[in-house]
């Protein structure tokens, strides 16, 4: 699963997930893309699960790009531990997603196949998504 090789600090503050995705909102690599229309957090497991659904459906055809990376650690205290005594240990990693962020891209397949594959992948994700095509200027 995806996670940073090394970070400057082990733990991060929770923070806020506000605003719209200004970067990573255009289809840059592939022909078709799955774009987020809601805000939320994607865990490394969810990203991997959707990637597997995509690759299984397109089989050997096409190339897939993952445009998000889980770089924020989420901590959790062990079960039945009293409050206090410091912050818990890192449990998993998440990517913070704003509306308009491109999550996955694909090329080398038909539009119909891409739509089917992205529908399967979107079912694995906790966010509302939409199918977008690359616009040629």
Swiss-Prot record:
Query: What Pfam families would the database entry show?
Result: Ribosomal_L16 (PF00252)
For this record, the Gene Ontology CC terms, alphabetical, are: cytosolic large ribosomal subunit
How would you summarize the oligomeric state and partners of this protein? Part of the 50S ribosomal subunit.
The similarity annotation says: Belongs to the universal ribosomal protein uL16 family.
Record bears the keyword RNA-binding:
yes
GO molecular function per UniProt: rRNA binding; structural constituent of ribosome; tRNA binding
Give the function comment from the record: Binds 23S rRNA and is also seen to make contacts with the A and possibly P site tRNAs.
The biological processes this protein is annotated with in GO are: translation
Q: What is this protein's gene name?
A: rplP
**NCBIfam families reported for this sequence:** rplP_bact (TIGR01164)
Q: Which organism is it from?
A: Pseudomonas syringae pv. tomato (strain ATCC BAA-871 / DC3000)
Q: Which UniProt keywords apply?
A: Ribonucleoprotein, Ribosomal protein, RNA-binding, rRNA-binding, tRNA-binding
Name used for this protein in its record: Large ribosomal subunit protein uL16
């Amino acid at each position: 699963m995806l996670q940073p090789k090394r970070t400057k600090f082990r733990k991060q503050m929770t923070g806020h997930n506000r605003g719209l995705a200004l970067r990573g909102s255009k289809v840059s690599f592939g022909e078709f893309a799955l774009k987020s229309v809601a805000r939320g957090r994607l865990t490394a497991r969810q990203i991997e699960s959707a990637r597997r659904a995509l690759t299984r459906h397109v089989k050997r055809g096409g190339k897939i790009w993952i445009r998000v990376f889980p770089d924020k650690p989420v901590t959790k205290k062990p079960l039945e531990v009293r409050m206090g005594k410091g912050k818990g240990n890192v449990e998993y990693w998440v990517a913070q997603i704003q509306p308009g962020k491109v999550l996955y891209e694909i090329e080398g397949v038909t539009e119909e196949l891409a739509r089917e594959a992205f529908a399967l992948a979107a079912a694995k994700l906790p966010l509302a998504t939409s199918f977008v095509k690359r616009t040629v200027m």
